[in-house]
Amino acid sequence: MLKYPDYLSKLISLLRKLPGIGFKTAEKLAFELLDWDKDQLESMGKAFSELSAARSHCPTCFCLKSHPESVCSFCQNNRDTSILCIVATPKDIFSLERSQIFQGHYYVLGALLSPITGRHIDAERMHLLKQRIEFLKPKEIILALDATLEGDATALFLKQELSHSSASVSRLALGLPIGLSFDYIDSGTLARAFSGRNPY
């Protein structure tokens, strides 16, 4: 019967809690960590301790911020107040920032609506979003949400909730990935790209 030492079993079990990590991958990572020297392991442990102690969210947009800072770097910077981009998670902000195409302000919902599981948007988070819109008075609100059933449900919900605002509400275009042949594109993506076509 296969039985790992307790410390190894515990590590594998913890690694499996990460999204997309099954037993085989967790096992492989655990054995890789066994080959690390003491300094590397202590650095890793310190990083986890700091993550637990220092993680905090910006009270303005709910993105991640460094510990003694009052707001995140995106709210500190002199950014365009005429555009507000609403995302589901802080990770989405960093993905958009890598594209270097958006210079406006952000707001993190914290979750997407799920018609299947019954998950809702936090009422307090929605209240603060409306306050943020009143303060910034943006001309445009961009919904940068996943192209999924949950993303669609959330976009529809937000459009209704924000109908009182004078800002126009738009959603990221959904269409064909660059460099991909029709052979590899599913019919749903192709249909959305076709219906959302732009003048050329």
From Swiss-Prot:
- Domain (Toprim) spans 82-177
The name this protein goes by in its record: Recombination protein RecR
Q: Which residues form a coiled coil?
A: none
InterPro entries xref list: DNA_Rcmb_RecR (IPR000093), Rcmb_RecR (IPR023627), TOPRIM_dom (IPR006171), TOPRIM_RecR (IPR034137)
The task this protein performs is described as: May play a role in DNA repair. It seems to be involved in an RecBC-independent recombinational process of DNA repair. It may act with RecF and RecO.
Family the entry assigns: Belongs to the RecR family.
GO biological-process terms attached to the record: DNA recombination; DNA repair
Please name the Pfam families in this protein's record.
RecR_C, RecR_HhH, Toprim_4
